[in-house]
Amino acid sequence: KFINHKNKSLSDEKDNLYYYDKLVIATGSKNNLLGIDTKEYQKGNFFSLRNLEDSKRIRKKISEVQTITIIGAGFIGLEIATTALQLNKDVTIIENSENVMGRSISKDLSKWLINYYTKSGIKFIFNKSFKSFKSDENSIMNIILSDDTKINSEMVLISAGSQPNDLLFE
């Protein structure tokens, strides 16, 4: 309930008081949803992969649409892009840097993967980021990028990393 750094104590919801020498708060992480309201995820056009239920929702939606936009070219984004491509979907990946899997692999391997995925049919947009979106009554969205480029898509998967799960401190 409360943390008192001065006297190194914390209390719970029953006002029990606990003292500590060192306090580690490990609340984990949550997906970076790029500031998109969770109501948009509930409408069923935006997706993010965190658990089995998310995976089932993504799988169902992929079977219903033709155009898929993935924001983020990390492991999850590339894996879902590959799956969608195998199902003959039109896939575009938006990445705010010039590499895929930039935090995990070398630039040379990244270039090789970009070439491989491009030859397979995946379209890449590099050095641009998600800015906003507009949707119509047919569930077609205009994804608006940082340079105001617009991309039409029926489904958007956000795989743009994670952020601290700081709900405890709100």
Where is each model-derived feature located?
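Rossmann-like dinucleotide-binding cores of NAD(P)H-dependent redox enzymes
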Residues: 67, 75-133
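A conserved short coil-to-beta-strand element within the FAD-binding core of flavoproteins
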Residues: 1-8, 126-139
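FAD-binding core/adjacent interface of flavoenzyme oxidoreductases
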Residues: 1-67, 143-150, 155-160, 164-166, ...
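Short low-complexity, flexible loop/linker segments enriched in glycine and/or proline
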Residues: 63, 107-110, 140-142
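Short glycine-/acidic-enriched loop or helix-start segments at secondary-structure transitions
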Residues: 34-36, 80-81, 103, 135, ...
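Glycine-rich Rossmann-fold phosphate-binding loop(s) that bind the pyrophosphate
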Residues: 50-51, 71-76
